[in-house]
Structure formats: C-alpha cells, structure tokens
C-alpha cells in the first residue's frame, strides 16, 4: 500500500525485487492508501511531490522495455496522478500530531526512521 511513509522508496523496492528475480516487472499492483487521510501521498508538500514525481518518472523510464503489459507503469502513473490531483498539505498538522502520538506509544521517533520526510515539519 502506497502511503506518505514509503512514497520515496517504492520504485527502489520494486526494482530491487525485479533485479533479484523475485518479481516480474508487470507483477506489481499499487494500492494507494485512502485512510487515514493524513497518511495519503497527496498530503506531501509540493516540493516533495516534485521529488517523488521525479523518482517515479525515472522508474517508469527504466520499466518501459520490461513491463510488457504496462501494468506496473500504469500503477505508477496512477499514483502520480493521484498525488498531484489534490493538495491536501493542509493535513500536515494532523499528520505530525498523530505521528507524535504514535512515537510516544512506541517510544520511537518517526523522523529518525524516515529522515527523508523530516522536511514535512517545515510545512506544518
């Protein structure tokens, strides 16, 4: 399931599994998280959306001659359209509040585990 947490890493994960022979390129279906809303990829601030778009575009280019049914390619394109179709960055304060709650319960620090998402706090 594609969420804010793994949005930067899904292409790398997909490619690694293909290269390891664990997965055929077209045997990939992206399920876009809908709830809770504050974990959705359309919550990312615009600058971070552009970074994710670049990663997905690069991955799609790599997949072009490998995904004969275009199933994975269409999934990544769909995720890109979903992410850019709506600006829900107004939910960033809810995201941070809920991450803080989870961090307190788990005795963890979300932004240490996902440092690439640290900049979200600047937009909350």
Listing of model-derived features with the role each one plays in the protein:
Residues 1-124:
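Conserved C-terminal portion of the radical SAM core fold
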């Amino acid at each position: 399931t594609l969420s804010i947490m793994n949005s930067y890493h899904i292409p790398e994960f997909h490619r690694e599994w293909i290269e390891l022979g664990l997965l055929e390129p077209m045997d990939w279906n992206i399920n876009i998280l809908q709830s809770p809303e504050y974990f959705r990829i359309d919550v990312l601030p615009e600058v971070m959306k552009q970074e994710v778009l670049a990663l997905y575009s690069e991955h799609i280019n790599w997949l072009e001659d490998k995904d004969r049914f275009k199933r994975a390619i269409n999934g990544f394109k769909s995720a890109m359209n979903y992410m850019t179709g709506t600006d829900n960055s107004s939910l960033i304060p809810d995201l941070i509040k809920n991450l803080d709650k989870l961090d307190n319960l788990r005795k963890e620090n979300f932004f240490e585990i996902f440092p690439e998402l640290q900049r979200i706090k600047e937009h909350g």
